[in-house]
Each structure stands twice: as C-alpha cells, then as structure tokens.
Amino acid sequence: MAASFCGSRRYDVFPSFSKVDVRRSFLAHLLKELDRRLINTFTDHGMERNLPIDAELLSAIAESRISIVIFSKNYASSTWCLDELVEIHTCYKELAQIVVPVFFNVHPSQVKKQTGEFGKVFGKTCKGKPENRKLRWMQALAAVANIAGYDLQNWPDEAVMIEMVADDVSKKLFKSSNDFSDIVGIEAHLEAMSSILRLKSEKARMVGISGPSGIGKTTIAKALFSKLSPQFHLRAFVTYKRTNQDDYDMKLCWIEKFLSEILGQKDLKVLDLGAVEQSLMHKKVLIILDDVDDLELLKTLVGQTGWFGFGSRIVVITQDRQLLKAHDINLIYEVAFPSAHLALEIFCQSAFGKIYPPSDFRELSVEFAYLAGNLPLDLRVLGLAMKGKHREEWIEMLPRLRNDLDGKFKKTLRNYLPVIRKRVSNEEGGREKLKKGNKKLDLDEEFPGGEIYSDEIPSPTSNWKDTDDFDSGDIIPIIADKSTTIIPNRRHSNDDWCSFCEFLRNRIPPLNPFKCSANDVIDFLRTRQVLGSTEALVDRLIFSSEAFGIKPEENPFRSQAVTSYLKAARDMTREKECILVFSCHDNLDVDETSFIEAISKELHKQGFIPLTYNLLGRENLDEEMLYGSRVGIMILSSSYVSSRQSLDHLVAVMEHWKTTDLVIIPIYFKVRLSDICGLKGRFEAAFLQLHMSLQEDRVQKWKAAMSEIVSIGGHEWTKGSQFILAEEVVRNASLRLYLKSSKNLLGILALLNHSQSTDVEIMGIWGIAGIGKTSIAREIFELHAPHYDFCYFLQDFHLMCQMKRPRQLREDFISKLFGEEKGLGASDVKPSFMRDWFHKKTILLVLDDVSNARDAEAVIGGFGWFSHGHRIILTSRSKQVLVQCKVKKPYEIQKLSDFESFRLCKQYLDGENPVISELISCSSGIPLALKLLVSSVSKQYITNMKDHLQSLRKDPPTQIQEAFRRSFDGLDENEKNIFLDLACFFRGQSKDYAVLLLDACGFFTYMGICELIDESLISLVDNKIEMPIPFQDMGRIIVHEEDEDPCERSRLWDSKDIVDVLTNNSGTEAIEGIFLDASDLTCELSPTVFGKMYNLRLLKFYCSTSGNQCKLTLPHGLDTLPDELSLLHWENYPLVYLPQKFNPVNLVELNMPYSNMEKLWEGKKNLEKLKNIKLSHSRELTDILMLSEALNLEHIDLEGCTSLIDVSMSIPCCGKLVSLNMKDCSRLRSLPSMVDLTTLKLLNLSGCSEFEDIQDFAPNLEEIYLAGTSIRELPLSIRNLTELVTLDLENCERLQEMPSLPVEIIRRT
C-alpha cells in the first residue's frame, strides 16, 4: 500500500531579522503572538548568524509558506540576513511564497533605495564583496521593500502592530480555499460533520465518513480540513492506495511518512510500531485519512483515540462502512445522495459555472440532470461533457441519453454506479401559446379564481383536469406578458397596494415563458399581484408540469419553498397585521373577559387587528385563521382543562407552531407555571376528571402540548392592573413581528422567549448607522425592565465617552448601581465586590452605540463579574467590537427591502408620487435616511421634488451627516483612503480588482476592506463592493470639502469638474484619481495636461453607453504621464505611442481598447508590477515586444488587433500568464512553444483566420478555442493536457488529422 501525502509545508512562517535590533523585544512578542494562533514558526535556536548560510536554513526558507522580513537599522550589517533575503526573494518569485515585510524604525524608502542610515550600514557591508553578490542584495532589498507591509511609524505602538501582523499572517495561512466555494451543498455537509466532531469537547474523537465512490467523500474531507486547520497546531491530510506489500517493514514505512508529515520533520526514522502513540500522545492533532481500504493500516496509524492528545480529531474516509465498525468507529457520517433539486444545481455548476441554468437551457438541464442520476460525480461528468456546447448540440445528445448513454460516457459511469437508470418518456413536442397584446386581463372573466375567495379555491390538481378554459401550458404565457394588467383579489387590495403594483410594474423585468423556475413564477406572481388566485395558479402549474414529464414528487411547485412563497404573498396583501387571541370563551370569568377586552383595545390602538380564536365550539382547527397571523397570544387559565375539545385544539395549535413561523406569547392567567407542568392545584382535579375515560396516547399529547407551551415562557398575572399587562403583551407582540422580519435576529427572538434565563447572557446587535439598533434595544429594555432588580440603559455610549470620559461614566454607573447615599466611588468597587453584591440579584444592562471594547469594560468594570440572571445588551456599528466584548453571536440588522421602504414612504407621501422610486434607491434601505429624505421631499411642490432630492444628495440632512461622520472619523488613514477610493471609483466593482489596484498604491487594502465591513460602511455581495448610496454621497462630500477648486481635490469623478481641470491645464499634485465618463464629450487636451499631476494613481477615460466613442483628442501630442499610475484606462486613445518619458514602474493594469497605437513605446520599460493588459480592437497595433519585460503579467487581451502578425518574442517571457485572448487577430499566423507557461489556463485564437501553426500547448490549459483558424494539425502535447475541459475546433476546415486523445480528455471536453 502506497501513500500520497497532501499536507502543508514544514513551516508556516520563516522570520528573517537582525538579532541585534529585535530578537529580545519585537521578535519575541511577535513569535509569542504567532504561537498563540497555532502558527508553526521556524526558530534557529540561537544559531550563530555570522557564518555562511547553511543548507538547513535554505531548506527551512524554501519549505515555509510565509516569510516575515523585519527590516531594522542593522539588518543590512549582516551578510547572513542579506543572503537570507536573496533566498526569500527567490522563493517569492519562483515558489509563490508569501512575503510580509515589517519596517522596524526604518523607512521603507531607505530600504528600497539603500539610503539614509540604512544605506550607510549597507555600504559598509558591501565593501570588498563581489559585484554580483552586491547586485543580488540590492535587487532583493528593492523588491521586498516594495511589497505591501507594515511600517511601525504608522502604528500607535508595537503591540497593536504585532497583533495586526499576526492576524494578517493567520488569515493568509488559514483562509478557506476557493476550491470549495462553488461546491454545491458543501455547507450542509460541513455543518453535519461539525455536529459529529463536537469540536468543543476536549476528548480525542475518531469519526468516519462513508459512502459509495463518487458521492463526494474526499471533497467533503478536504473542505473540512481547510476549515478546521486553523484550530490545530499539527495537522495532516493523507491519501492511501492499495499495494500488495503489507509486512512489518511496510508498517514502519507508513509510520515514518505519517509522522514526518504531521511533525514537519524530514527523514524521520522509527524503530517500532509504538512510535505514533509515543510521539502524539500529548499533542492536539487533526488527521484525515482518505480512501482507506485496509484495517491493518488503521490499526497501525490510528489504533485508538488514546494515542492522541486532548482535543484531537481523526477522520477516516472509506467506502466500506464495515471497516469502520471493525475499528470501533461508531460515529459515522453517511454521505447521502442529493435531492433532485440539489442534483440539478450540481449539474448546472459543472455545465454553466453557476447553480442555475440560462433561461434557454432550463428544460434541457432538468432532463439531463435526471438522466445523469443522483451521484454527484456522474452529474459533474455529464455537466462538464456539455459545458460550452450550443443548445442544438444538447438537443442532439438528448435522444441518445434517453435510450442508452453513449458508449464512452456509460463506460465512465459504470466505474461508479452499478446500474444506470434509464428514463423513457414521451415528451409533448409543442405548447400552444396564447396570443399576447396590449390588453387588460380581468381574471374574473378569463381565469377561474381571480375573485374566488380562499375557502373556495380548488386545491386538488384533479379539479383542473376537466376545465376547458386553457390548455395545460397556458398559465405562464399569461403572467409573463408585461403588457398584461392583472386585477388583484379585491378582498385584500387597497389604494396603497395598487399604486405599489404600478411602481413594481416599471421596476421588474418581464418573465420569460416556459423558461423559469418555480421560484421565478411565484416571485412574479407576488410582484405582479396575482395574489387572490395564487393558490389556484400554482395548482394549475402543478398539473401543467405533468405535460413536461415531471413526476409529482419531483415537481418544484409542490416544494416547501413554494409554500413559503405563497405565505409571503399572503402576508404582503395585508393592510394591517392580524394577531390571534386564543381563549376558551364559553368558560371565561369576569377577569378573563376584562383582560381580553383590554388586549383587543390595545391591539387596535397600536394598529393591529385582533382575531379572537375560541378553542371551544369548533370541530376542526381553523387553518385559514392560523395562516392569516404571525403572532398568537395564548391566554392559559384553569378553564383550559375543563374541556377535551380545548385541549385537543391546544395540541393542534402547538403542532402548527412547530411546523410554521407562528410566534406564541403565553399569558398565564391566575395560574402558576408549576401547576401546569406538574398538573397541580386546580389543574390536577380538572385533568383527572377528563382522564378517567380516555385513551392514554391522547392524554400524553395533552401533557406534551402543555409542556411545550410552558417552555416558551411568557407573562404571568395573578392580580394588579390588567391594562398595564395588556400594554406589555402588545409591545412584546409588536417587537417580535419586527424581529421576525429582520434577518439574523433569531437570537434576539430567543432572548424574548427565555426571559427568565439563569445564565449570564451578553447579546450584541450591530448594523449600519441609522438602521434602528437603538430602537430595538430600547424596546427590549422597556419590555423586560419590570422583571429585573436593577436596570440601566446608557444611550449614545460613544458620544458620552467623548463628553465625560470612561472614568466619569463609571462613577455614574456605580452611583446608579448602589445609590448615591452609599457614597461608593469607582475606586472602591472591585469586580469581586460587584460579583458578591449582585450574586442573587437580576440585572438588565444596555450599552447603546459602543465603539470601543476597552471603554465598555472600563465603564462597567469588565464582563467577568456578571453571573446568573444577568443580561447585557450591546449595540454597535462594528461587529468586531461586539466580538471583543465577548458576544458569542452578534445579530445583524438587515436593511429594508424595497417593499418595506415603499411602505415607509407611503406613510409620509400621499397618492402617486414621481420620486418614490428614487427615494428608495437613494436611501439604500436605511430607515433613518429614508425618513429624513421623504420628510424633506414631502414639503416640496411636485414639480420641485426631483431637483430637491438631487440637492439633498449633495448636502444631506445633518442627522445623516453626523451618523456617517462618526463611523468615518474612527477609521485610520489607510482605511479612510480606501473608503474614499471605493466611494468615488469602485462601488459595484469586484473586491479582488479593487485590492489589486489599491495595493499597488501602497494601501493595505484587504485589511482595510475587512475593517470597513466590520464598521458597516460597506458590504460584499457576490464578491462585489456594495456601499449604501448615502455613504457614497458622504464620501464624495468629504472629497468636495478638501477644496473649492476641483484641481486641489484628491479625487475627481464629475465630468464637469474634470473637463474644467483638463481643458484649463490646471491639474496639481493634489489629484490622485480621475474617472471620466466621456460619453458625448468632445474636447482637446494639451501635451502638458498631466505635467503637474505627480501623484495621480488612477486614470480612467471611458464611455458608459454603448456606441459612443471617447473623443478626447491630443492634436499636439502628449509629453508624459505620471509615474505613480497603477491604472491607465483610456478608451480610443488617439496617439500611436504612449509618451516616451512615461515610466510605468507602478502600472498594474493597462486598459486601452479601440486605441490608435501601433506599439506602446520605443525601447524597454520597467513593467514588473503589470498584471493586466487590454488592447482589444487596437487595429493598428503591430508590435507587443515590450511585453517581454512584464514578467508578472497574468492577463493579455488582444482581441481584434487585426494588424498583429508575430508575438513569438514576447508571449513566452510571460511566465505567470493565466489567460491569453487573441480572438479575431486575423493576420496572426503562428504561436511559439508555450510549454514554459505553466500557469496559462485559457487560450483563445478563435477567428484568427490565417493562423496555421502552434508548436506546443501550455501544460495546464483548461480552455482552448481554435474555431475558424487555418490550423492543419494539433501538437501531440494536447494528449498531456490533464486539466483540459473545453476544446473548440468548430469550422477548422483545414484540420487534417487529430491526435488520438485519452478517454479522460474526451470525457471532460
């Protein structure tokens, strides 16, 4: 049996440093922080550092994932350090090692250019040294100093920077691999494995993963390993394959390799089979053994959990469940086959790169996924086989798949599946569609159910089979027609809703008939307001889909998701929220009657509709009434047990509660919880009387229902004011309704359900400024304050800390706690005293708007003294602050949806209003912004509203400015600059793109973006930067405030300002970025237009509208461009060269489509940082020889460069190239050998009609497009392309022969 090991390198981190400067101070603290994060760091154990660098140290550098280079004053005095640096630089270039430079009391520019004190020290070291050695040192110093790192001069103290360095290293080491981000369903598997592994337990644990081949066991294990690795200092992922050798020496060999991998020790020798236990008994390890098929191997390597230290986890993966049992592994995760819906997503991910198919492939995808079966590997194989193929090819393949899978694919599947299921179905070829036109469709006349009330709607699908109104495929075309106006169910409609339907009609796209999912249709039904007949329509769709051959159990319209959509649709039609009040009306006493009246009156007062639900006098549960409400108030009294009927209904209500999102608020009216739980007091006698003649199982259901409702918690009343209780109950109901509509606030809902919790709870609420955190915290406080011995609500904590300082706030807090008469000061009260004093008292404490965890701890004396019955609620704009305050799970308040924003708008604006859509967009779902904007706009005349709204964006209300400023002012300079760049230039752009460009500008962009997310200033949606419009406006206002004159501002985006600066030649060194939308603009620029913009980092001239050309002319040429540019994007660049004086040393992206350039410039330039070059459709371009200097180039786009003939001298030099697009380069004839381009994944030569010859393919190509070329034969190296998934040879009419390809490549392509 042979083993292939796929664990990590020997060391996580290699530190390079001068021991004279940092060993006993900075380095010692850094190593401690790294060790605390379980990061394996190389230590030289006092190795003498004035000798020549030896082989062991070179090996340690090469086998480390990250090198931290600590530049200090005397770093360059050591040839040892400088030789180390050369090796690190080599590993950075050749092995993609991560390098983190740290500048300890030395400026980066001094290191980079060897100037100042650092340069003097370096000069002394260089004396008498060979020139080639000095040159290597200088190159390494310049290159490494140019990498984004940490400069101590930019940090308040060493401790803060050390913590940040350690955090950054940890993130770089342990970030989850992108390899698993697009694996469909992986999160559910990881969650299931986490519950089996019980990571919080200190006991070592051995578990198994079992399932057939192809089910995804290894993928799950690799994702699990990636996720858990940060928690274990020692870890290994090992894959085994069977071999015939199985003797004692082989077992020793297994152990040697196994321990070498885990311990990071080379050439380790073991003498006996007990070495695993002896080496790992006291170590916490993570071990994953993949593809195990030999019990002896398990006994040898992981004999029992006692061999490993506390907290260790061992995961064994096998197809043989009995092998796990034989090794006493009883905790086994059996990987299940995916559901039909999940199988479709797996197939689509492979076929289209996303979990849903394009609209014109929907029906085909459903059938292909069905025919592939439910084994993930088969689904992926078939998906990859169809990837990139045209729809006609799919249709052509379909008959073969239905009858018998084509031979090669079937042969592949047989390796994984014993039986290939066949599906024979007769598909109806066509669907007769309704003629569409601009007409008003009244469902009363043309569709049964338009005005049918809910209790009249036919539910069984069989009821539709005899209707002659429409053919089975007619429903979707009707609702898809955007010109159709649908009359909603008038029972539920009102003027507000009708106006919203018109508002939506202009915002939502039309629905494409027959090419939509169940969710698409239901979404469309909801937004187009076919709500009165939604259930009927869905029934019709269920029946219609049978015509497509979809089985009832596989029908997406029967899914729970559709049910929830229908309920959401019903929710949206309500004018007011309905709240149920459960009671036994026939047995009420005077107090209960009075209380129900008080509840009803208070509900009306707060805008709710009370629905009284009598549990007596009903044969069956009224489901319509239950589904019509989201909250039910249950009044529990002794009258409940006076009737079997009421108890049966209680059981039914609780069953409904368990399966829906109904919230129950119990009121224990003149009864005690202990009486209900233990059936004591008045409950006991009444229950015994009912019990005597009944079956035991019915009685047990009653008891279970009563236990469940008691577990919820609630309100008790024995005597006192019923009106006060009614107010408290209704406030509770109102808050719960709000929290239920707010995503991720389920924990706060749980908080309300367990008001008498005995454990200390520290809850946290976070979200962007103006989202409503304070309002929610205040509601919770007022609701629960009566139940606590001591309550304290400190609003505007951040502002109060600025005004009074934390010490004074602590004095106020102590005074509130103990009372001023006790005369205790902050210095008198220690945490231990607090713990003892409040040991048997309950405390409710709210700190609102916390911005600093240390301030919070200083005011309340830390969080350690709180104990049972104490509850702390914190609100903050920063999630990280809450985590630092020991909040286990912070709850985020989501922004308002468009619908919720619309409802809020209608509270202030009457009738139709032309700016509602703009108000919703401009507020970005922030309640504070929306209220203030709507309030201001509502005071204007209709004709002035739009202009007034635009002026508000340039000068927002004071409250919006103050809310934003507080967050912005708390950022450091790095984060402020990043935020302003994002606000001015990168909103809606890819995060990776922003990081690439801004890192080149000297910012720590990744860390900055993380901090901005934590501060709720931005968010990521599909890896794109999203920023609320009010925050973007405020960011731009800050830039405007820099100076009245645009030429003195750092960032320019307004076309009028930019044109003024450019045409007047008034640019200055203050300008760092220009993004000009030149659509419909025409202007002439001076040759010296950029002459004084020394600090310009980002330059983009573009056209946002198709068909327009960027008409910025340079009639007298262009003298130069700023050397600081990291982005140069200029569409339709008018000159034949870039300025010869331009030094692109900092250039990361050169994007100049449709330019007039013949070549970039004469001679060689420093292009070390250049990553992307896009010169597409530059029809005069003939020479790209200068790209040979761009050694780090990753993406080349030369599409449509029709004058380009030869690239043989430039492309082979781009050793890090990932994609090469030369589509439609019609004069290109050949390409040189690309065997050295090991990173190249995509090659596109489609449309290169004269292209004839390619010598060799890059070895790791995944996509090759040669359609329409004149190629005669393919290189034999195509047989070795193990990663190839797409090979396009369409219309290659001169292709004479094709090398025979391995079956694996044919299967993938």
Curated annotation (Swiss-Prot):
UniProt-annotated catalytic positions: 84
* Residues in TIR domain copies: 9-173, 574-737
Q: Which domain of life is it from?
A: Eukaryota
Molecular function terms from GO:
ADP binding; ATP binding; ATP hydrolysis activity; NAD+ nucleosidase activity, cyclic ADP-ribose generating
InterPro entries, A to Z: AAA+_ATPase, ALOG_dom, Disease_R_plants, Leu-rich_rpt_3, LRR_dom_sf, NB-ARC, P-loop_NTPase, TIR_dom
- Where are the membrane-spanning stretches? none
Q: Where is the NB-ARC domain?
A: 187-418, 755-987
Q: What is its EC number?
A: 3.2.2.6
- Disulfide topology: none
The record's Gene Ontology biological-process terms are: defense response; signal transduction
Record's keyword annotation contains Repeat: yes
Q: Which reaction does it catalyse?
A: NAD(+) + H2O = ADP-D-ribose + nicotinamide + H(+)
Alphabetized PROSITE patterns for the sequence: ALOG (PS51697), TIR (PS50104)
Show me the LRR repeat boundaries: 1145-1167, 1168-1195, 1214-1237, 1238-1258, 1259-1283, 1285-1307
What sequence ranges are listed for the domain ALOG? 488-585
Q: Which EC main class describes this enzyme? A: hydrolase
Checking Pfam families in the record gives: ALOG_dom, LRR_3, NB-ARC, TIR, WHD_ROQ1
Would the keyword Coiled coil be found if you checked this record's keyword annotation? Answer: yes
List the coiled-coil residues.
1114-1141
Protein keywords: ATP-binding, Coiled coil, Hydrolase, Leucine-rich repeat, NAD, Nucleotide-binding, Plant defense, Repeat
The domain section of the record reads: The TIR domain mediates NAD(+) hydrolase (NADase) activity. Self-association of TIR domains is required for NADase activity.
Q: Which family does it belong to?
A: Belongs to the disease resistance TIR-NB-LRR family.
* Record's function text: Disease resistance protein that cooperates with RPP2B to confer resistance to Hyaloperonospora parasitica isolate Cala2.
PANTHER family noted in UniProt: DISEASE RESISTANCE PROTEIN RPP2A, LEUCINE-RICH REPEAT-CONTAINING PROTEIN
The entry's protein name is Disease resistance protein RPP2A
Its taxonomic placement starts with: Eukaryota, Viridiplantae, Streptophyta, Embryophyta, Tracheophyta
